Amino acid sequence: MTISAQCNLQKLAFATTLAVTIVLSQGRAIGQVKHGSPIELAKADVSTAVRQDMANEVRIVGSLTPIRRSTLTSRVSSTIIELPVQIGDVVNAGDLLVRFERGALESAVTGRKAEADALSAQTELAEAVLERNTRLGERGAASEATRLAALADVLDLRAQLRSKQAEVSDAERSLSHAEVRAEFGGVIAARSVEEGQTVPLNTQLMTIVELNRLEVDAGVPTSRIPLIRLKQSVELTVEGFPGRTFSGEVARISPTADAGSRAVRVFIAVDNEEGLLRGGMFTIGDLRVDDQKDVIALPAASIRHDADGFFVLKVEAGVLQRRPVGLGRSWSDRDLVQVSGVSEGDVIVTAPLPDLVVNTPVIIEGI
């Protein structure tokens, strides 16, 4: 006989022995029930009903990120002559962050204004010529062509003057950007330049963040999204603060799921008035939904059903009694079902023992 055949025979013998054992065990249990002998139940087979607060929990995992942040860029091409802040410095709204060299910018304003003044003078002269040619034309001393040429000169100079005035405004605006100030109070999170450095237009200078309020960007499975609502509270634990929780609330929910993970982004806002938290800290939390206060919930396996409806088996004076129940909410993550018709302190069979029937005498191990 081959080794494979021997293994198959051994497996068959084991399966046959197991099946016989189960049948004999069930037969003994049924025989005990039929003859009124008490059935011995383990402590794990029963539970005592207690009132408790229940809720579904959605796990939130993510990193803290400042809600308000601003990346400042240079709006002029110039040399940095003053840079009074470093990474980590706390600044207030209006504080000076960067000062650029103003000489070239001031010269640009002066030059544009001089050009605008010259065009303004030329325009006034052209307008006077147009007025004189118009009067002469009315007396027949000047032709219509002369008047039209003078009018064209006026219109052209006026257009040039408007363009030059716009250049003056641009130069003045650039001069006003020679100082970069904080738009809001916060902390310098990054700095990309050094004092004395000449930077071109639109160079990234630094990033400022506000730490009073942070958020967690968490991905929640689509199956759990129907449980989530705006303003729901969340209890968060943050790395570096063992034993302490921080409160947050649902601020925003993305309208679409991520194509790859099939998760929906949920943003949890967290107050940080103490200033303890920092961007990038890893956090884990539980979002409690569908809170139910002072309810009795039993394991789903304890709920039985017959032609008369749902019921549980209550151990009363050493005998199993049928207790009809109504079903409420369920908490699938804990395999519990809210029930009515059961009182606090009732001892209920919670193990899946289908052979147990009403009026069966039982004893509970260790009691």
Swiss-Prot record:
The keyword Transport does not apply. GO terms for cellular component: efflux pump complex. One of its GO terms (molecular function) is efflux transmembrane transporter activity. The keyword Zinc does not apply. Keywords: Nodulation, Plasmid. Gene3D superfamilies: 2.40.30.170, 2.40.420.20, 2.40.50.100, Helix hairpin bin. InterPro entries: CusB_D23, RND_pump_MFP. Belongs to the membrane fusion protein (MFP) (TC 8.A.1) family. Involved in the production of Medicago-specific nodulation signal molecule. PANTHER family: MULTIDRUG RESISTANCE PROTEIN MDTA. This is Nodulation protein NolF. The lineage of its organism: Bacteria, Pseudomonadati, Pseudomonadota, Alphaproteobacteria, Hyphomicrobiales.
